[in-house]
């Protein structure tokens, strides 16, 4: 690797280091081999998770609403008892996803491994980083559509129809805009209007969650913020999008994958030059002076190691 790329990656280490709960295994990027396509909504709409309470598991201080697991998510609801709750979710792929829910709050947790058998284990904070087991259960998930987990908001990609980021996406993109046009427009806007927040990157703490509207209003963020903002804007346009967390080389990083109808999942792909897709994640691009040099690095999928899909 050239000295210039090494220097850039060293800088990005300071900007993009995020502490993520350890996984029991490594995830793999997947493509849709079922022939299924994402649902079509006319007019376009932002999907809103619901927790009607018709089917629940657990007990106070933590209830899991599984009424809509066929839509690709469950909702964790924590009592206001002053303790943080931890939900660990795993499927047959061996990846353990860990979610923390503060006292009195709720969180939407997606089934990003698709249909299948999931093991959910729940814990309550006892003291500091010590947690005691609450309950565990096996869930059988059969999705109505395999793309739903990547269209709904969740704890990591948190948005509503009233989010400024969603309103912006709808204002930037015409109703009849193609997916390629939508992806390119959102990509260009975010990378041109958001810059690295070095102070935030230097002080980010364990359990950090992006606030997409804060990123938009301040025009600053770290790698996690870039990826979450773009993911939310694309999902609000009914474009399935994965927020990926892992490593670029040996640096903790976040990037996005998008689904193009009739083409499939495009991994680490954000822009389209009219002839081919260029693998380009938004944080490297926004902070790169030598575009050709950095594209030669980030365009190689071997440089990316996936840990989690959110």
Regions found by a protein language model. Give the residues of each.
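N-terminal accessory/pre-domain segments preceding catalytic cores
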Residues: 2-180, 265-268, 301-310
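Short N-terminal helix-initiation segments at or just after the protein's N-terminus
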Residues: 63-64, 199-204, 223-225
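Secondary-structure boundary elements
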Residues: 153-218, 266, 274-286, 293-310
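Active-site nucleophilic cysteine motif
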Residues: 182-186, 219-234
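Hydrophobic/aromatic-rich core segments of domains that either
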Residues: 225-303, 307-310
């Amino acid at each position: 690797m050239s000295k210039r790329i090494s220097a850039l990656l060293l800088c990005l280490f300071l900007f993009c280091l995020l502490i993520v709960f350890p996984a029991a295994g490594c995830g793999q990027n997947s493509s849709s081999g079922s022939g299924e396509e994402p649902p079509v909504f006319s007019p376009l709409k932002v999907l809103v998770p619901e927790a009607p309470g018709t089917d629940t598991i657990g007990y106070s201080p933590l209830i899991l609403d599984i009424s809509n697991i066929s839509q690709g998510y469950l909702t964790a609801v924590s009592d206001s008892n002053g303790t943080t709750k931890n939900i660990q979710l795993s499927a047959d792929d061996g990846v353990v996803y860990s979610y923390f829910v503060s006292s009195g709050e709720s969180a939407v947790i997606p089934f990003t491994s698709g249909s299948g058998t999931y093991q959910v284990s729940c814990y309550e904070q006892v003291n500091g980083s010590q947690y005691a087991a609450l309950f565990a259960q096996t869930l059988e998930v059969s999705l109505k559509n395999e793309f739903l987990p990547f269209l709904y908001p969740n704890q990591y990609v948190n948005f509503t129809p009233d989010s400024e980021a969603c309103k912006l996406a709808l204002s930037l993109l015409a109703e009849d805009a193609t997916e390629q046009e939508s992806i390119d427009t959102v990509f260009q806007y975010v990378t041109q209007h958001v810059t690295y927040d070095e102070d935030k990157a230097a002080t980010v703490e364990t359990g950090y969650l992006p606030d997409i509207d804060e990123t938009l209003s301040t025009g600053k963020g770290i790698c996690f913020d870039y990826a979450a903002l773009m993911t939310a804007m694309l999902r609000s346009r009914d474009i399935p999008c994965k927020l990926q967390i892992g490593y670029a080389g040996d640096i903790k990083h976040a990037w996005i994958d998008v689904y193009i109808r009739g083409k499939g999942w495009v991994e680490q792909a954000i822009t389209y030059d009219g002839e081919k897709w260029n693998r380009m994640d938004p944080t490297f691009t926004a902070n790169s002076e030598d575009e050709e040099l950095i594209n030669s690095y980030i365009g190689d999928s071997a440089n990316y190691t996936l840990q989690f899909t959110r």
